[in-house]
């Protein structure tokens, strides 16, 4: 389990891309062809990035969609690992491989 929350998509976007290029959120929105609120929500970590947004960000900043999606996935996993309700539910999940009758999984 990760102890420190991973750097967010918004932080990376702001510090590594927007600031060095002197871009504002409104500039990013125009470049991405999205509403300013959409760009603001991403930069301020109020919303997750979608597959479509990852592809757009990759094109704009000459990266890959996987770069952006991996950042988002790391945050999502960290959030789940630290979500008590989910962890309680997960404790009730049993591995299928420990079942006595494995014939239902045979091909």
UniProtKB/Swiss-Prot annotation:
Cited Pfam families: HTH_3 (PF01381)
Record keywords: DNA-binding, Transcription, Transcription regulation
Record has Nucleotide-binding as a keyword: no
Keyword Cell cycle: no
DNA-binding region listed in the record: 24-43
Domain spans labelled HTH cro/C1-type: 13-68
Regions annotated as coiled coil: none
PROSITE patterns: HTH_CROC1 (PS50943)
GO molecular-function term, one example from the UniProt record: DNA binding
Tree of life domain: Bacteria
NCBIfam families, per the entry: antidote_HigA (TIGR02607)
PANTHER family: ANTITOXIN HIGA-1
Family assignment from sequence similarity: Belongs to the VapA/VapI family.
Record-given protein name: Uncharacterized HTH-type transcriptional regulator HI_1251
Organism name: Haemophilus influenzae (strain ATCC 51907 / DSM 11121 / KW20 / Rd)
Species classification: Bacteria, Pseudomonadati, Pseudomonadota, Gammaproteobacteria, Pasteurellales
């Amino acid at each position: 389990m990760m102890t420190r929350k991973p750097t967010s998509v918004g932080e990376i976007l702001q510090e590594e891309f927007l600031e060095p290029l002197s871009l504002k959120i409104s500039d990013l929105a125009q470049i991405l062809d999205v509403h300013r609120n959409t760009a603001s929500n991403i930069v301020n970590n109020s919303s997750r990035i979608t597959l479509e947004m990852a592809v757009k960000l990759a094109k704009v900043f000459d990266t890959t969609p996987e770069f952006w999606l991996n950042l988002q996935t790391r945050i999502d996993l960290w959030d789940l690992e630290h979500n008590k309700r989910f962890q309680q539910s997960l404790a009730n999940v049993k591995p299928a491989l420990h079942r006595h009758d494995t014939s239902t999984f045979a091909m």
